[in-house]
């Protein structure tokens, strides 16, 4: 689940020239397995309300209580399975970090891993009711991702004493970011040297994938979560620092995403709803 102001994967936002991020906001929800749904309605400025602790986008909202992130979801899923997606998500961090990572030297892209270790309770339609590991972060940017990056991967893996997060990004100028971060359950964070990158099977759309893995071990996909021509999200098993773990892995090919041919395809999955009234 992601709240966007300036929906970076919206074709409508790109077609607008990205002049007004507040006019392209959304609450993106993806559920997996039987009955899985995907919501990413691009909404206009009229649907956006912000306060220091609450983000409201049309009929849905995210609220920070000081100790929990509570998300009230009221969306319609995208084709081919068009139906209401409603319910509540409660994320409780075990600790909050003070980490802020500059992904590009000019400060145009920032990653803020608020709570890589958290508990989550999900109660949504289509029978998606569960609790388990949660994760809470944010990205901030003043430039388009595809303008500054060629490719990146990200992974978050539970380990015995917290979580290990890895960012590997290749910028368009050829420079590279290789970041490892260990976050303890109480939010204490420290930089770590990532194990060597190891390739594993490409996605259904043949997006290249790799993730850190101890020498002599090989990562593998446990479950595909989201596949697009330029993007893969999956549960991946790897071994890091002697621990076998299953976490969430993402791969984003921004060379593919730059193609204007993708935009009409995305418009089917990302409908535009510019009007809204809170009255």
From Swiss-Prot:
Its EC number is 4.2.1.131. It is an enzyme of class 4 (lyase). GO terms for biological process: carotenoid metabolic process; chlorophyll biosynthetic process; photosynthesis; spheroidene biosynthetic process. Pathway: Carotenoid biosynthesis; spheroidene biosynthesis. The keyword Coiled coil does not apply. Keywords: Carotenoid biosynthesis, Chlorophyll biosynthesis, Lyase, Photosynthesis. GO terms for molecular function: hydro-lyase activity. It catalyses: rhodopin = all-trans-lycopene + H2O; 1-hydroxy-all-trans-1,2-dihydro-neurosporene = all-trans-neurosporene + H2O. Belongs to the CrtC hydratase family. Involved in the biosynthesis of carotenoids spheroidene and spirilloxanthin. Catalyzes the hydration of neurosporene to the corresponding hydroxylated carotenoids 1-HO-neurosporene and that of lycopene to 1-HO-lycopene. This is Acyclic carotenoid 1,2-hydratase. It comes from Cereibacter sphaeroides (strain ATCC 17023 / DSM 158 / JCM 6121 / CCUG 31486 / LMG 2827 / NBRC 12203 / NCIMB 8253 / ATH 2.4.1.).
